[in-house]
Amino acid sequence: MSRLILFNKPYGVICQFTAELGHVSLKNYISLPGFYPAGRLDADSEGLVLLTDDGDLQNKISNPKYKLPKTYWVQVEGVPTQTAMKKLCRGVTVKNYITLPAKANLMNEPTDLWPRIPPVRFRKHIPTTWLQLSINEGKNRQVRRMTAAVGYPTLRLIRFAIGDYTIADIAPGGWHLLNTT
């Protein structure tokens, strides 16, 4: 039987157990031995990180060939146009590659959203918008690069789900342990 931890990673935490100067790591939150992250999430992003004690499960979660969708709540600067949203849905050019098509929708600000520390910068004359963006790949800083490529920089990024696993009812810094078959 495999075990899986659903961890709601706070802003500023790095996705490794070894501490680095100036960063809080997973070891500050999870003390169970034998668990390793299945994928990563940047220190300046928040939300779901899955950790497991099973190498095969870790591969199935993190390997793009299994096409496990990752769903993000993204606060962007400005109000995206229909053209920008269609580009996200078709795939956009980021550096030297074209991203796979994404599912992208405008959304209301998530309910029960915790405050980010430090807070997102506020600009009185520039509105912000929330998007729900689902992708099946996970290249480094991909969501941030995708929104920037269509003209709307990411201000806050929260991974809400990986496949059917979500951070619903898990406070930042909190985690749930599941037994899987």
Range-by-range predicted roles:
Residues 1-181:
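RNA pseudouridine synthases
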